[in-house]
Amino acid sequence: EVGGPTAWVGGPARAAPPHNPPTTRPRQTRPPPARGPPTASTTHTAPSGYRTARDPAGFSLAVPQDFTRERQGERVFYLSPGQTFRLGIKVAPPETGGPAAVMSRAAADGPSTNPGYHDGRVTETTHAGHPAALWEFSWNGFSAAEGPRHTYDLCWEEGGRMYDVWVSAPVGKVKEAREYFDVAVDTFSVTAS
């Protein structure tokens, strides 16, 4: 799955409008309770139905129990059975302009990297006190069988690295996708790699 000029996002969706588009603007991600910067000892509790994935790429986050890990180049994916839901993570050096510029460049390239790209928007926000950007869009999917998809993608810089977490799902499952996305982002921690 690809996205943006640096391929930050997790896959395309159909040009048809979503069946159940979010009814509100993207919310700002909630920072965790007040505390110091994440460390290797920082832990987050996975909600019921989730497990904490301590990834060898240097992070941990909560993923649904039945999601399996797959490395694809510079990205790590946690995939649902049948790959209906794709939770992706990319860790990279910071890029010029920070998260908002990265997501804006990716959104500008959306039509060339995500077939049928539409309804893309980038919102500046914060994540755990760090400047961040949320990119949300719909697209056709990579194949007719895959069908229309919707993607939520949050990018931020922390500790000299750029982190990108996204969830891509069928447009008819945006509510479930948003839950997976929110849990992943809210439980994400940098760990010793």
Feature locations, PLM:
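Hydrophobic single-pass membrane-targeting/anchoring helices
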Residues: 1-38
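Solvent-exposed, non-transmembrane segments of extracytoplasmic/periplasmic domains
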Residues: 24-193
